[in-house]
Amino acid sequence: MASTADFKNGLVLVIDGQLWQIVEFQHVKPGKGPAFVRTKLKNVLSGKVVDKTYNAGVKVETATVDRRDTTYLYRDGSDFVFMDSQDYEQHPLPESLVGDAARFLLEGMPVQVAFHNGSPLYIELPVSVEMEVTHTEPGLQGDRSSAGTKPATVETGAEIQVPLFINTGDKLKVDTRDGSYLGRVNA
């Protein structure tokens, strides 16, 4: 059990027998009336996102989630294979469980896999990754960093928006949460 004061992003709650992860939350103390906590919850299995409001201080049931450090090894058909960094056990996870994170998975990448009662729930990528641009249209003479964006394909096949001065072969830093361009990496 946890109080609303213990809420943090990533905490997994048990609501009506289902597991919900806190995506974001906000403590609100209005000038009139009691304080409350506004949350955005994501169903761990279905991916459905809902908004839920709790009165401040309410106790909620939390799930015991074991986060393990793993390394992404390879893709095997529709499964993604991860190796536990402690016992070297391999865990094949289905594409449905990996979800949108597959866009930024590179072989050898360190990834955290969350388990509940021995079953994998979801994966957590590093916040940013370095990737090489495999294709983008060439920039024009006089392009500046703030002049706009263009699509670029990175080595995993994901398409992201990058500034006009980025060329094929450049190494970029990409935010894995939303796929946004963070900067160019000096080689």
From Swiss-Prot:
The keyword Cytoplasm applies. It is found in: Cytoplasm. GO terms for biological process: peptide biosynthetic process. InterPro entries: Elong-fact-P_C, NA-bd_OB-fold, Rib_uL2_dom2, Transl_elong_fac_P/YeiP, Transl_elong_KOW-like, Transl_elong_P/YeiP_cen, Transl_elong_P/YeiP_CS, Transl_elongation_fac_P. One of its GO terms (molecular function) is translation elongation factor activity. One of its GO terms (cellular component) is cytoplasm. Involved in peptide bond synthesis. Stimulates efficient translation and peptide-bond synthesis on native or reconstituted 70S ribosomes in vitro. Probably functions indirectly by altering the affinity of the ribosome for aminoacyl-tRNA, thus increasing their reactivity as acceptors for peptidyl transferase. This is Elongation factor P. The lineage of its organism: Bacteria, Bacillati, Actinomycetota, Actinomycetes, Mycobacteriales. The gene is efp.
